[in-house]
Amino acid sequence: MLTAKQHELIRFIQQRLEETGISPSFEEMKEALDLKSKSGVHRLISALEERGFIRRLPNRARALEILKQPEDVVGGGAKAAQSGSEASNVVDIRTAQAKTVPAPINDVVEIPLHGRIAAGAPIEALEDHQSLPVPAALLGPGDHYALEVSGDSMIEAGIFDGDFALIRRTDSARDGEIVVALVNNEEATLKYLHRDSGRVRLDPANASYEAQVYDPHQVQVQGKLAGLLRRYH
């Protein structure tokens, strides 16, 4: 049986997979579940993983696969079969296969590689005319391009210097999503996006860095993170 928070989290992950094709970030899960810290998300994910509901895909950030799903919430209404506090925070489950239709494992597509992007202070986003071969299974629907990550400000999100960030083109994003933000029409950076009191805040995922705050007209969303590729030397 799952706790109510575990049930809520797996439902949220499934919803985001169906909507966007990628699992939510830890920041998005923290906000969706109204948790105070990302450590609470880590504990919930570890518990779901131990119980065989999800698994983390190796060498990929924001890569969660649902293996089975909770079906019925126990507690309240006609389905309440338990009593007291236990019934209010525990859910009964029936296993069900996750609805995933992965691309053939050998399918490779080439997407544009547009230079380097800062996971630190903003740097110029280069428009190099190169391409990057990517397993099709890593990409969902939409138009994509790649940027090579420079810096360490997103390491707590599993994004490291030298990684290739796979970006889905879009000019809009929700709070808490990792985006490519063009600042003052000349510099690009990879950060969590937040809107706060009429300002735009670009948050790092590294306690050594401070958030960057701008007026809305200074920041243009040019895409959001869809996946990562990493080279091992």
UniProtKB/Swiss-Prot annotation:
The keyword Lipid metabolism does not apply. Represses a number of genes involved in the response to DNA damage (SOS response), including recA and lexA. In the presence of single-stranded DNA, RecA interacts with LexA causing an autocatalytic cleavage which disrupts the DNA-binding part of LexA, leading to derepression of the SOS regulon and eventually DNA repair. GO terms for biological process: DNA repair; DNA replication; negative regulation of DNA-templated transcription; proteolysis; SOS response. Residues 26-46 bind DNA. HAMAP family: LexA. The record marks A119, G120 as: Cleavage. Its EC number is 3.4.21.88. Homodimer. Keywords: Autocatalytic cleavage, DNA damage, DNA repair, DNA replication, DNA-binding, Hydrolase, Repressor, SOS response, Transcription, Transcription regulation. Belongs to the peptidase S24 family. SUPFAM superfamilies: LexA/Signal peptidase (SSF51306), Winged helix' DNA-binding domain (SSF46785). One of its GO terms (molecular function) is serine-type endopeptidase activity. The gene is lexA. It catalyses: Hydrolysis of Ala-|-Gly bond in repressor LexA. It is an enzyme of class 3 (hydrolase). Pfam families: LexA_DNA_bind, Peptidase_S24. The keyword Repressor applies. This is LexA repressor. The active site is at S153 (for autocatalytic cleavage activity), K191 (for autocatalytic cleavage activity).
